[in-house]
UniProtKB/Swiss-Prot annotation:
GO molecular function list: ADP-glyceromanno-heptose 6-epimerase activity; NADP binding
Domain notes: Contains a large N-terminal NADP-binding domain, and a smaller C-terminal substrate-binding domain.
UniProt entry keywords in alphabetical sequence: Carbohydrate metabolism, Isomerase, NADP
Catalysis: reaction(s): ADP-D-glycero-beta-D-manno-heptose = ADP-L-glycero-beta-D-manno-heptose
Protein name, entry field: ADP-L-glycero-D-manno-heptose-6-epimerase
Record note on cofactor: Binds 1 NADP(+) per subunit.
SUPFAM superfamilies xrefs: NAD(P)-binding Rossmann-fold domains (SSF51735)
Active site residues per record: 140, 178
Pathway, per record: Nucleotide-sugar biosynthesis; ADP-L-glycero-beta-D-manno-heptose biosynthesis; ADP-L-glycero-beta-D-manno-heptose from D-glycero-beta-D-manno-heptose 7-phosphate: step 4/4
SUBUNIT field: Homopentamer.
Gene: hldD
Naturally occurring in which organism (per UniProt): Pectobacterium carotovorum subsp. carotovorum (strain PC1)
Gene3D superfamilies (UniProt xref): NAD(P)-binding Rossmann-like Domain, UDP-galactose 4-epimerase, domain 1
Amino acid sequence: MIIVTGGAGFIGSNIVKSLNDIGYRDILVVDNLKDGTKFVNLVDLDIADYMDKEDFIASIVAGDDLGDIDAVFHEGACSSTTEWDGKYMMDNNYQYSKDVLHYCLDRNIPFLYASSAATYGGRNDNFIEERQYEQPLNVYGYSKFLFDQYVREILPEAESQICGFRYFNVYGPREGHKGSMASVAFHLNNQINQGENPKLFSGSENFKRDFVYVGDVAAVNLWFWQNGVSGIFNCGTGRAESFQAVADATLAFHKKGGVEYIEFPEKLKGRYQAYTQADLTNLRAAGYDKPFKTVAEGVAEYMAWLNRTV
């Protein structure tokens, strides 16, 4: 059995899909379905069982036998960069992750988890997986950074796989439940389908991010599990592309509309990453040599998926 926490969420459900694609169906999804809309991410997928997150935490803290587990993909977290309830964030992201990690270490279960490029903070170069480059801007980034630090202390003595991935700007299928935290491609598509012009902040040709397609993110997770590699790795394309490029790819699919530029919001000034670009040196050195989709390629595939029934 494989456990995917956050398995009804964006990246988690895409990992479930990728496992299904290689014939794996003995999957336990752990999630919190208080937001019932997330169930749609699972309806076309095959899983063996579902467990509520609180019940799962109680089970692992009690040391319950959950059966023969091949791996845990720990994607369950609060991923909102605008959430400032630090107690909630540390319970949900840091303590929960420690509980799952120790359950896995005690049983030699491979543990692969979601870190984040938010650990780097507002820098605009040297996105390298080393302490000197890490200075998160928000409590979400701090919760991810602190768990990475915890893992770094444990890694040298660990007898089973521990692997963390610093996800950059992930976009693609099954993110609709994320609301305002969904990708810009998702929102631009909605705006066009509602008869509006797609909207970007003024200067969006200068705002560049490492936009990585969720299918590529799932592929990275599966490769590292199958190859037993441990460590903390950036998970992006290694390319910074502009928000304008995302809009251009969206418009190219729809063949209508033009970008409308709006003022940059005051509340985001100083808390907004204007530039991200994953350094893939360590990922490539670990042996992962598959290509990553460009924005033009990934957005085209995503638009086809989003509009398949429209």
